[in-house]
């Protein structure tokens, strides 16, 4: 009787970190793996200006080619002259374009011997013979066709639209994804609250600007025109003030027929447009709030609740912001106010 063959023992290198069962057949692979736990990258790139590091020499060598631009791996196909930076990239290319064993979908048109790995690739190719795109829209009355399924799927949304899923009672259907996102932002965004005064705002940007009014020290932008003492919390509001009050520019005109009104700010035009749209007027929730002038809105300084009515009236009469004069020193068109 012949001797029994001894079983082949494969040495495994096991990760010693708790809750990690990774194991490898080579020691260098384990060392590279351990770097994921420790965060070490012992193989830094020595190219000037490149601060990348790698867990193994193999990865560093592969990266170094990006600096030299060398392409030492030629395609295995005799009919192809393409070269690649890595062997892996060359193999991917070969399997995709030259490995006929993987191409099971053959074109049956006379004189064409092309084959493809995927059925949809064959259908796209057949367009060159039939001049008919393979993926037709199933919607009744629509005769559009597309070359790939993804384009058809995107087109079908034109018919189905984008129904709102934020609220079961909301019947909105957006014709485009952009209109859907705009609807969600305007109608379903949860309001954000100021921690100090409990005032709520529709958008985080509004809250961020509002919080500046609570700071002990804040930068305000003063109007540089002689005789004008107005100041604003943002540079944009200062520019809007100068355009509307000093230069009398109102670039946002209402496009509704027989309405010649124009506004200095886009938001003012949007608020005004509701007047011409009965549907929007029905949907718009009415919440009691004091009337404020453009100057008051731009300044970012809201009068106390008890004095809101008198302040609003004074603003309308005088055309100026009702506020206490700030103390501070002017620096480059701005003031640092201490409360």
Curated annotation (Swiss-Prot):
Keyword RNA-binding applies: yes
Matching PANTHER family: TRANSCRIPTION FACTOR IIIA (PTHR46179:SF1), ZINC FINGER PROTEIN (PTHR46179)
Organism expressing this protein natively: Xenopus borealis
Biological role: Involved in ribosomal large subunit biogenesis. Interacts with the internal control region (ICR) of approximately 50 bases within the 5S RNA genes, is required for correct transcription of these genes by RNA polymerase III. Also binds the transcribed 5S RNA's.
Gene that specifies this protein: gtf3a
Record SUPFAM superfamilies: beta-beta-alpha zinc fingers
Compositional bias annotation for Basic and acidic residues: 275-288, 305-316
UniProt lineage: Eukaryota, Metazoa, Chordata, Craniata, Vertebrata
Annotated protein name in UniProt: Transcription factor IIIA
GO cellular component: nucleus
Keyword Transcription belongs to the record: yes
MF (Gene Ontology): DNA binding; RNA binding; zinc ion binding
Gene Ontology terms: biological process: ribosomal large subunit biogenesis
